[in-house]
Design a protein with these regions (language model features):
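Gly/Pro/Ser/Thr-rich low-complexity, intrinsically disordered segments predominantly at protein N-termini
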Residues: 1-156
Length: 156
């Protein structure tokens, strides 16, 4: 692990309740979807007073955190550790744990989660209610929905 850290190969690694999860860097197709998603989210997020970012540390400390592919943040967000976010997005890669992160995101009061699956060409928009996520057609935070996003994404 020290060698991974020194080489910078641990940028996407996460710690789940003290358990280290090694996550490889994204593929070209993943990176392409991520860049396009950031561009598509920028205007509706800005219009709603939210800031768009790429990967960030969601959690309180190095002992339990996740690194989503990106997110939307309210004014005042910043620093190394984000206790919450308005929205996080995950891009599904083979063998990843995007869906398993939902309970963690719920515990950290992330309002919405967007899970984009390039293989299936789908975008699942989820909203937090009563401690769990449910699929919704449109975001409650920004003027965008899963159908429109799916249509506009430049799929690999």
């Amino acid at each position: 692990m020290d060698r991974r850290r020194r080489a910078g190969a641990d940028r996407f690694d996460e710690v789940w309740e003290g358990v280290y999860h090694m996550v490889p860097g994204p593929s070209h197709a993943h990176g392409r979807i991520e860049a396009h998603l950031l561009a598509l989210l920028r205007k509706p997020a800005t219009d709603a007073g939210l800031e768009v970012t790429g990967q960030f540390n969601l959690g309180e400390s190095e002992h339990d955190f996740r690194v989503p592919d990106g997110g939307l943040h309210r004014a005042g967000a910043g620093g190394m550790w984000h206790p919450t976010a308005a929205l996080v997005f995950e891009i599904v890669s083979p063998g990843d744990e995007s869906w398993q992160k939902l309970p963690f995101y719920a515990r950290h009061d992330v309002d919405e989660v967007l899970i984009v699956d390039p293989t299936e060409r789908t975008a699942a928009w989820l909203a937090l209610g009563d401690g769990e996520y449910r699929r919704v057609e449109r975001s409650g935070l920004i003027e965008l929905g899963s159908a429109e996003l799916t249509e506009r994404l430049d799929w690999p």
